[in-house]
C-alpha cells in the first residue's frame, strides 16, 4: 500500500507540461492504467489525464479561433490561381524574347567586331604603304635638299622619317622589298648625321659672326632633328654672350658716371634695371619661336640658362655697389652705433638716405623681373601641362620655385635687404630722436613740430620699405616703426604728461601772488623785474596742453597710416607678390600698429583725467559748494526776487564758461569736447552731493528745477556729448522736489512711470522727499515704492 501523504511515483510516466500539446497522444498508456490496483495511483493518473485534457482543449480553442482567418486566406489563394497562371505564361514568353534578343545581339556584335578588325587592319596596311612611300620620298627629298642647301626642307624630310612608326618599318624590312628599304634607311641615317653636323657648324659660324637671322634660322632646325635640348643650350649660350657683353658695357659706363649726374645716386639700380630689361626683351622676342618650333614647356629651359648668366652679372654689379657705396662698412658702423654704451662716433643719418633708397630700388627691380619670369614660365607650363598628370604639374611647379627662390639674384637681394633693415632702423631712430630734440612750438598752433616730423620720418621709412616690393622687408619695418612709436616716442609724450598741469587752486593762487610780490619787491630794489617764474608756469600749462594735442594727433596719424598701408598692400598682393602666409604676416603687423593707436588713446585719456582733476575739479567744487549759501526754503517774494536776480546758476555758468574758454583756444576740438564731457560728469556728481545736503520747500524745489534746466541748456550748447543722460538723476530729484504732496510720487512711479526710467532707488527717492521740510516723515515712510 502506497503512503497516502506522498504522491505516487509512476515509473515511465512524466508530468504533462502546461500548454504543451501539438497533436501528440497521451503519455499514459491503457495497459498502464489496467495494471494499476491502488486507488491513490489511479487518482494520480486521473489527475494527469485531466491536465492533458485541459491542454488539448486550449489548443483546440486556439485553432478554432484561427479558423476564419485561415478560411479567408484560402479563399484568396483560390482566387489568385488563374492570375498566377497568366503571369507564368507571360514570364515564359518574355524569357523567350530575351533569349532571342540576346542571341541576335551577340551575332550582330560579333560581326561588328569583325568589321572593326578588318577596318583596323586596312588602316594599318594603308599606313604601312604610306610609310614605305614616305620613306622613299624622304630619302629622295633629303638628298635633293642637301644638294641645294635647302636645310629647312632637308630637316623637314628627316623629321618625317623620325616620326615614322619604327615597328612598321621593321615589318617592312621583313617583306619582299626589305633590301630596298634597308638601303633607303641607311641613306636616310647618313643624311641625318650629315645634316646634324652641317646645322651645328652653320649655327656656330652664325653665332660667331653675330648674324642673328642665321642664328634663328638654324635654331629652328634643331627640334626637327630631335635636338631640342642641344638647340636650346646652344641658342642660350649665344644669348648669354649678348647679355654679358651688354651688361659689361653698362657697368663700365656706370663706373665712369660723374657724381654730379642727376641719376648718380641710383646708378647701380639703373644698371640692374638695364640688365633685367635686356633679358626680358630677349624672352619676349624669342618666346614665340620657342613655343612654335620647340613646343610648350620648353621656355623654362631657355630661361634657366639665361638666369645663370643673369646671376653672374648681378653678382658683379652688387660687388661694385658694395665697394663703391661702402655698404658693408656702413652697416658695421650702424651696428656698432645701435649697441648700448657704444663709444663709436655716430654716423650721420643723411649719409644713409641715398644708399637705402638705392637698395630698395634694386630690390624692387629684382622682384619685378622675377615676377615677369614666373608669369612667363607658368603660362608656358599651363599650355604644356593641360593634359598632364597632377604629379607632372607639381614637379614643374617645384622646378619653377627652385629656379626663382634659389637663384643667386634672390639670395643676393635677401642679403642686401637684411642689412638694409638694420640700417633703416638706425636711420629712423636717429632722425626721430633728432626731431624730438629739436621740437618747437609756434604760437597759434595746436601741436608742436615733432609730431609732423616724426610721422614724416616713419612714413618715409615704411614707404621706402614698401617700395622694395618685399613683404618681409615691409613687415620688418612696420614692426620697427611700431616699436619706435610705442616705446621711445610714446615715452617722450608720457613723461611730458607726467609733469602734470600746474595746479590752480585758491591756495596756489595765494602762493603765486605772494611769490610775485616778493619777486617784484626784490626786483625793484635791484632795478629790474624778472617774470621768469610766472612765464615758466604758463609755459608748463601750454606744454601740457600741446602734449595732449600731440597725443591725439599721433593716434589719428597711426590709424591713417594703417589704412594707407592696407590700401597700398592690396595693390601689391593683387600683383602676385607674396601668398596667403605673407598676407597673414602683414595683417598681424597691422594689428600691432592699430594696438599702438589705442595705447595713444589711453594715454590721452590719462592726460585728460589729470587735467580734469588738477585744473577743473579744484575750481568747480567751490563754485558748486556756493549752492549752500543760497537758501531754497523761500517764500513767494524771494522766489520772484530770484527770478530777477539769479543768486547762483548764472554766476556758476559764467565761471564755467570763463574757465573752459582757456582750454578751448589751446586744445583740438576732439580733446576739448572730451574734456567738456569730463567736466559735465564732474558737475553732475558734485551738484548731486550738494543737493542731498540741502533743504527745500515747494518754491525752493521749483527754483532748483529752473536752475537745473538753465545749467543743462548751457552745457548742451558747449559739447556734443549726451548731457541729459548724465543729469538724469538730478532731473528726477528736481521732479521729486517739485511735488505738491508726498503721494504724488506714485503718479510717476512703478506702472505709472510710462517711458520714464527711474535712475533713483526707492531709498534714494525717500531721501530726496525728506529734503522737503514741508513733507512729514510719517507720510514718506508710509509710501509703498
From Swiss-Prot:
Name the record gives this protein: Conserved oligomeric Golgi complex subunit 4
Subunit architecture: Monomer. Component of the conserved oligomeric Golgi (COG) complex which is composed of eight different subunits and is required for normal Golgi morphology and localization. Mediates interaction of SCFD1 with the COG complex. Interacts with STX5.
GO biological process, one term: retrograde transport, vesicle recycling within Golgi
Region (E domain): 741-785
Broad class of the protein's primary localization: cytoplasm
Cellular component aspect of the GO annotation: cytosol; Golgi membrane; Golgi transport complex; trans-Golgi network membrane
Record's keyword annotation contains Amino-acid biosynthesis: no
Region of interest: D domain: 618-740
Region (Interaction with SCFD1) residue spans: 2-84
Associated pathology: Congenital disorder of glycosylation 2J: A multisystem disorder caused by a defect in glycoprotein biosynthesis and characterized by under-glycosylated serum glycoproteins. Congenital disorders of glycosylation result in a wide variety of clinical features, such as defects in the nervous system development, psychomotor retardation, dysmorphic features, hypotonia, coagulation disorders, and immunodeficiency. The broad spectrum of features reflects the critical role of N-glycoproteins during embryonic development, differentiation, and maintenance of cell functions.
Keyword Phosphoprotein applies: yes
Modified residue annotations for N-acetylalanine: 2
GO molecular function: identical protein binding
UniProt-annotated stretches for the region Disordered: 1-24
Record key words, sorted: Acetylation, Congenital disorder of glycosylation, Cytoplasm, Disease variant, Dwarfism, Golgi apparatus, Membrane, Phosphoprotein, Protein transport, Transport
Region Interaction with STX5, residue ranges: 85-153
Family annotation (InterPro entries): COG4, COG4_C, COG4_M, COG4_N
Matches recorded under Pfam families: COG4_C (PF20662), COG4_m (PF08318), COG4_N (PF20663)
Job description of the protein: Required for normal Golgi function. Plays a role in SNARE-pin assembly and Golgi-to-ER retrograde transport via its interaction with SCFD1.
Superkingdom field: Eukaryota
Membrane topology: Peripheral membrane protein
Consequence recorded when altering residue 729 to A: Severe defects in glycosylation
Family: Belongs to the COG4 family.
